[in-house]
Amino acid sequence: MLEKLMEEGMNIARLNFSHGTYEYHSKTIQNLRLAIHNYSKKIGYMYPLAIALDTKGPEIRTGVLDGGLTEVELIMGNTVTLTIDPKYAENVTAQMIYVDYPNIVNVMKKGDRVYVDDGLMSLLVQNTTHSTLECTIENGGKLGSHKGINLPGVPVDLPAVSEKDKSDLVFGVEQNVDMVFASFIRNGDALREIRDILGEQGKHILVISKIECQQGLKNLDEIIDASDGIMAARGDMGIEIPVHKVFVAQKIIFSHCTKAGKPSICATQMLESMTYKPRPTRAEVTDVGNAVLDGADCVMLSGESAKGAYPLECVRTMANTCLEAEAAIWQRQLFDDLRYNTPCPVDPSHSIAIAAVEASLKSRAVAIIVITTSGRSAHLISRYKPRCPILAVTRRPVVARQLNLWRSVIPIQYIMPPAQDWMKDMDARVQFAITYGKGMGFIKPGSALIAVSGWKEGAGCTNTLRVLYASPHEIY
């Protein structure tokens, strides 16, 4: 199944650490790497699938259902008790629900609302004691284990990084994950704490901040500056702020990321109906397409592929919709706007990135080939949203995997050892990208190409741009 998902277009695998044990996640990572190995052998080149660790974050969640049940029903109008007593942590019933936030009994008062499971169920607080909240069920539903709880408008004093998060981050470093999706980020200080925990051994790991609360939106620019990327996590966001404002918040997040040159991810309920049905609603397909038009670099599936009955169909539908949406963007106007708003002066690599996109538009190039070590040149070119794919050739596996976050970038891991003649080695890597593009079908003999690289060995920056034309035969 994992190999089939990669074939359909999956390029980042997200592990949700709100659920599962370390043994479970370790086994999943082993399975992913085995699938990557097998799929790479099948297609004849290294498939750079990235692995992301999604932290639980400073969330509030319910306990485990009693007796191994998968769900219990909360009936509208009934009374239910929320308790902080640990003895109910694994004995949750429809009448008594454990909550893992001890201070909830102090911050809540009569008349406040508690939202459960992304707002599917709502409870109205009637009375508080030193260890419980007596509530009336306003909107019922089926409750499972470890479901999220939101307290909109109520200031909570949760730590930026919980003890579980710290342990999970250390586990992620040991497992050599490529990126961390940090939940419920409220300010830039949380990012600095996460990087301290990752330490020297995990300094290569990208930290993507999930914006899902009012404080996160208020401090958006501060968080963008401190992050490697941003995720618009619309599930909790739609509870923390009025649901009719979520689409505006999404557009603000993506536009700020585009301006800052940071990758952005759109997540939550994108193809929710496909969890149980083989075809999406028209509104869901429109949502995916509009996320791309809004400027998102990535779109993400969660429950649809994690527990759904049609994971392959979900990935296929999402990939096809993204292709259609990308073709509908007015690339020239977008590029001109982005270039106009770039402050001057910029460094040589940045100048070359702008020139490469301009040259690709003027020459009608079918691809921009970037020879990169750190991936920064590909990031910069992606920032200006070219009309053609960016083939980023690198020898570093972690760079290839992480480049999946950036829009238009197709990472290619080059595994051949360096040639003694640096210029021949450079040309061989460019030819490798051309051969890849021919195999994918978007490079034809005679196609115009833009090649971006350094001008000599050890240059340390990208400062050379060439316009090439694909040969009908392979040179190397």
Model regions: which residues?
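Non-catalytic helical/linker scaffolds that mediate oligomerization, partner binding
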Residues: M1-Y476
